[in-house]
């Protein structure tokens, strides 16, 4: 039977459900509005908003101007003053009601995420579930975290498109729970519709949240440098992150800037290849479009044949395709490793990096192909990229020093432990690293030399949930660390002159357990 878009995820049906659930958040043309000054308004200049799944237009994203954003920030900062008079029990109650509403709309939000950012169903559901369970944990645990601390003020959030709920919505709700007013910018590349319902439900529950959309550069003066913003939470690339960091260093403002580094997996005197293969396969979730993806494997030369025996079959087994397709109306949505990348521009960027590396002498170990049976006939597949793996990428290539943020791996062969450590520290600071080694002592010794915030031994590390701290070393992270009590500390203050845990220009203070 021919493939079709599953009836349960037809876009027209989903947007109908969405407008019925939160009609106040949509204009007369059916497109989302911004949540400014406590009201859904300001359609701005609508910009085409398309899905990477098949290139079709989903709607128009409102692009507001700087002055409108400044008004939104001014109102949100004033709203903080009244929010500080709401006690913790009431804040808990309102956040809990919001979580109940999010849970009731879980399927709708998950389906929206599939269209907006191309996640297969299981990953889209996981994004929503981790948001809900994570904020629930804070509702239960936050009271001792707030002892002796007061909220900072208005928190501004500028986040990437890849985790609209488990990162952005989660942070917003915890920041409000801690007593702060919150404003966020919708990621331009994805999350417009899914975040619109989340913020509409939060606003209905009496939470002091605002949502704006527009060009990051155009709105930076309002959302970053504005004196009414007490703290900034940023998730994105190094180039934008560096510019933001430079604008904040001489200002009395808290910041948490999560950027990227090259996350490496080192293989040294290791034998459990089946376990490593399972880790590698899991690591391909969402096409490695996340800041904690492992994109570089540094392998002892004598182990390279056995490593490739475990590694290459994983790449051949990966299932990539349109996540919305079924072969009959009542069939379940497909189980895929990943769908499209976020847009065709990203695919083109990765192909250029790949061509540059091969042209400079890198060895092409694997170049996957898309299976046409996982797409509609004639559909746009320009945002899809099968996995690629390169051996010995020359040092003068961008792939050697930069995180690809997509399904391109690089393999480096070394002979000595010192080389292993040097190659794993290529970006002079990153978020996660791992060592595969049969000897725990050797693994710990190597791990101690890595410029990585988290180091795993025979396992991959990730952002983590609940009480697990998250941060980065070197250029991969600037400002306060987050996760567990550190997230609450980052948006509250105690005594004057407090030195938060984090990575700052004049000091780095690391948690004992990470």
Where are these regions (language model features)?
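Structural detector of well-ordered beta-strand residues that form the stable sheet scaffold
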Residues: 176, 183, 210, 256, ...
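Rossmann-like NAD(P) dinucleotide-binding subdomain of oxidoreductase/dehydrogenase enzymes
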Residues: 142-277, 332, 414
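ALDH superfamily catalytic-core signature
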Residues: 204, 239-394, 457, 502-514
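Conserved C-terminal structural/oligomerization subdomain of aldehyde/semialdehyde dehydrogenase
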Residues: 1-4, 56-60, 89, 228-229, ...
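Short acidic active-site motifs
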Residues: 68, 218-221, 419
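N-terminal Rossmann-like NAD(P)+-binding subdomain of aldehyde/semialdehyde dehydrogenases
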Residues: 2-146, 317, 342
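Residue-level signal for inorganic ion chemistry
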Residues: 38, 55, 76, 91, ...
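Structural signal for hydrophobic packing residues in well-ordered secondary-structure cores
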Residues: 80, 84, 99-106, 110-113, ...
């Amino acid at each position: 039977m021919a493939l079709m878009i599953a009836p349960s995820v037809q876009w027209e049906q989903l947007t109908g459900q969405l407008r019925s659930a939160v009609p106040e958040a949509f204009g007369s043309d059916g497109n989302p509005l911004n949540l400014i000054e406590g009201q859904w308004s300001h359609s701005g200049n609508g910009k085409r908003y398309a899905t990477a799944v098949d290139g079709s237009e989903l709607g128009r994203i409102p692009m507001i101007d700087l002055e409108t954003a400044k008004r939104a920030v001014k109102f949100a900062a004033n709203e903080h003053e009244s929010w500080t008079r709401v006690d913790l029990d009431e804040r808990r109650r309102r956040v809990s009601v919001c979580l109940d509403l999010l849970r009731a709309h879980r399927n709708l939000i998950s389906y929206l995420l599939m269209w907006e950012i191309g996640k297969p169903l299981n990953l889209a559901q996981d994004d929503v579930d981790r948001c809900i369970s994570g904020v629930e944990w804070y509702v239960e645990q936050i009271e001792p975290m707030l002892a002796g601390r007061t909220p900072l003020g208005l928190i501004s959030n500028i986040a990437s498109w890849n985790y609209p709920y488990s990162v952005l919505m989660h942070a917003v709700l915890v920041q409000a729970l801690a007593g702060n007013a919150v404003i966020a910018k919708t990621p331009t590349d994805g999350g417009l519709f899914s975040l619109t319902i989340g913020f509409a439900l939060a606003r209905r529950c009496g939470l002091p949240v605002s949502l704006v959309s527009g060009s990051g550069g155009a709105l930076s003066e309002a959302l970053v440098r504005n004196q009414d913003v007490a703290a900034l939470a940023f998730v994105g690339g190094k180039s934008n992150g560096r510019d933001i960091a430079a604008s904040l260093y001489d200002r009395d403002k808290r910041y948490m800037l999560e950027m990227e580094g090259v996350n490496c997996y080192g293989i040294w005197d290791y034998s459990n290849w089946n376990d490593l293969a399972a880790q590698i396969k899991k690591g391909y979730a969402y096409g490695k479009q996340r800041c904690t993806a492992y994109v570089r494997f540094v392998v002892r030369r004598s182990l390279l044949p056995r490593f490739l025996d475990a590694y290459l079959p994983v790449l051949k087994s990966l299932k990539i395709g349109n996540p919305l397709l079924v072969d009959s109306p009542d069939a379940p949505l497909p189980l895929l490793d990943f769908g499209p990348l976020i847009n065709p521009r990203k695919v083109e960027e990765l192909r250029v990096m790949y061509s540059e590396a091969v042209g400079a002498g890198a060895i092409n170990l694997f170049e996957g192909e898309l299976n046409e049976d996982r797409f509609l006939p004639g559909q746009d597949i320009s945002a899809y990229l099968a996995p690629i793996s390169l051996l010995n990428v020359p040092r003068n290539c961008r792939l050697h020093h930069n995180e690809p943020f997509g399904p391109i791996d690089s393999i480096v062969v070394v002979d000595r432990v010192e080389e292993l450590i040097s190659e794993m520290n290529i970006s002079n600071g990153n978020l996660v690293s791992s060592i595969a080694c049969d000897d725990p002592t050797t693994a710990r010794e190597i791990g101690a030399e890595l410029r990585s915030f988290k180091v795993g031994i025979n396992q991959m590390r990730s952002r983590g949930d609940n009480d697990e701290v998250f941060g980065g070393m070197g250029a991969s992270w600037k400002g306060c660390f987050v996760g567990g009590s550190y997230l609450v500390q980052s948006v509250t203050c105690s005594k004057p002159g407090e030195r938060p845990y984090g990575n700052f220009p004049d000091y780095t203070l690391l948690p004992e357990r990470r």
